C-alpha cells in the first residue's frame, strides 16, 4: 500500500486519483480504489483492510471476494458522485471545500462495501456488530467532515448491505429481513460499539490532514505547525491578545506527543465508558449520557465560534447534521437504559471521587506553582491571577482551546511541559480510576451475599430452584445464627420469593418457621409476601398458616432408573438417540470455564439467534441466560458433531440436600434450527444417563413457567394475569409446548405453587411476578389493564 503525502504535488494522486468531471472510459475510474492520497490515509486504509477485508475474503472466498470488490467499486463511485452533486446543489456542505473538487483516491469505500456484503454471511452476532460499526463510522465521517470519499464510503456500505441481504434471503428463503430482539448482554455491547464508533469519528477525521469539515482548521494543526516558536513569541510579545498571537499558539500547542495524547483523551474516556456499558454498569450509562450532552454542547460552541453566519437557516441545518451521530448515540442510550441496571457501591464511588479530587488539586497546584516559580518560562510575566484564569484551559483538549483566548503562553521547554501535561495527567488518572471502578466488582456486599448464599446452600438443603437464588438481581434475608436464608425481589411493594427458604447445615428450625420469620421482617418493611414456585409440601404448610395457594407451574422429574429407555413408551427417545449416533452427534458434559473460547462464542451466538426470533425481550428470574452459564457449579451438556458444529446446549443447576448433590435441574435450552432436529430430546436423555452414572436418583426438567394443566388453573384476577402472560409468551418462548414435549420421557409431575395471604393484593402480585420475569422492561398495557379490571377471586 502506497500513499502520497501531498496530493497537490504527488504524481501518484495525479496518475491514480479520480477528479471531476469524469466519464466511464476515464482510466482513473478504475484506479481510484488502488491507493490512498496521503501516507497517513494509507496506514488507516491498511488497518481497514486487515480488520475488514481479510476476514471478508475468508468468508466469501478469493474469487467471490474479488468479484464483489469490483462490483462495489464500479457501482459506488457513480452513485457517490451523484449524491455529492445533490449535497452541493442543496448547499448542505458549507464547512469545507466543494466535494466535487475533491480527488477520490482511497480503497476504503470498496473495503467497507465488501465487509457489509460479507456480513450477511456472518453469524447473527457479528452481522449486527459489523454493520453497526460500519454505518456509524461512515455516517459520522460524512456528517463531521463531508468529503467525496466519505460519501462514497457510505454509498458502498449501503450497496454492500442491501446486496448481502438479498443474497442471504436467496439462499435461505423465509428468514428475517429486520433484526429481531436483543439479549440484555448484546444490547449492552451494541450500545458500547455505537458510542465508541461515534467518538472515534473525529479522531479518524483528524488523522487525515486533507479533511474538509467544520473543524478542519483545528484538525490540520495536529500534523504540522505552520509557525515557529520564536515567531509565536514575537507575535505575543507585541500583543498577547491579538488574533495572530492566539492563532500561533493554537498551531504550536497542537503539535507533539503531549497535545496528541490530550486530543485522544475524549476517545480514551469513551472507550472506558464503553467497557462499563458492556457490563451493564449504571454509572457508565449516566456518564455516557453526560458525555454525549457535553459533546453536543462543545460541538455547537465550536461551530458558533468558527462560523460568521450562525444565524443563517442553512447554517442551522448543517450544524444539526454534524451533531446527528451524537444525538443518535444519546437516543440509543436513553432507549436502552433498562439494560444498564448494575449499580456500584456508593462507598466505592466516594473513594474514587476522593482520589480524583486529590489528583486535581495536585495537578492544579503543579500549574500554579510552576507559573510562580518559573516566571521566565511564560509570557507575559505570570501572576497568581493570570495563572488561575488559565487553569481551566489546562484541562481542555487542544482542539477545543483553539477557539478560546489564553492568558499565559509557554516560552521554554519547562513551560511547554507544564502547559501541555497538567491536564493530560489528570485525565489519564481519571481514565484509570474509571476503569477500576467500572470493571471491578460493582457491589462488594451483593457479591459477598451471593458467595455466602452459595456456601450455605452447598452445605445445607434447598429445593429444585434454589441454585437460582445466587443469581444476580436477588436480595437476601438471613435467618439468625446462619440458620438459612430467603431470596426475594421487591416489585410494586410485593416481596416475591424465589422458591422456599434454604436451610443451613446446622439449622434447628424448619422451613415453616423461617417463612414466618421472613414474613414478619417483610411486614415491618411494609411489603406483602408472595411465595413463588414452591413445592406442594411447603404450600400446605403455608395454608395452615392462613395462606391461599395457586398452582403456577408443572415440574417434570425423570428417574435415572429409566436410563436404558426400554419399552414402547420411550420409542421417540430411542429414535432421537439412534439418529444422533448415525449423524455423528455426541454429547459433552462440561462447565463454561472448561470450554474453549471458540465454543463459548458458539454458545453465545446460538443464544443470540434464539432471542432474535422472539418479539418479547429476554427474561430472567427463574429463566437463566448466557450470563448464568459461567457459574462454575452449573454444568453444560452440549451436542456437537464431528466437525465441532454446535447443534444444541442445555445447562443444569445443582440441587443440594444436606450438603450433597442429589440431582440437577434443567435451565437453559438452545438449539440450532438448521441442525440436528431431535437435539433437545437427545440431550435430555443423555442427562438421565449421566445422572445414573453419577449415582443420582433423578434429573428435573424444571417447570414450564406460567403453564398449568387443564382443570387446575385459577379463574380469578391473578389466574387471569398469569394465564394471559403465559399465553402471550407461548409463541415466543414455548413454555407450554415444552411442557408437552417433556411427556415423551414419561416423567413424574409435581406442581409448583404461589402462596399469598391477602386476596386484595392479587392484582399487584400478578403484576409483580410479571415484572420479575420482564426485569426492567415495561409491562405490557394489556397486562396492566387486566390487573385493574378483572375481579378478585377468593
Swiss-Prot record:
Provide the Gene Ontology terms for cellular component.
plasma membrane
Question: Among its keywords, does the record have Transmembrane?
Answer: yes
Question: What stretches pass through the bilayer?
Answer: 34-54, 67-87, 99-119, 132-152, 257-277, 283-303, 315-335, 353-373, 421-441
Q: Where in the cell is it found?
A: Cell membrane
Gene Ontology biological process terms from the UniProt entry: phospholipid homeostasis
Name the domain of life this protein comes from. Bacteria
This one is known as Uncharacterized protein Cgl0966/cg1103
What is the source species? Corynebacterium glutamicum (strain ATCC 13032 / DSM 20300 / JCM 1318 / BCRC 11384 / CCUG 27702 / LMG 3730 / NBRC 12168 / NCIMB 10025 / NRRL B-2784 / 534)
- Lineage summary: Bacteria, Bacillati, Actinomycetota, Actinomycetes, Mycobacteriales
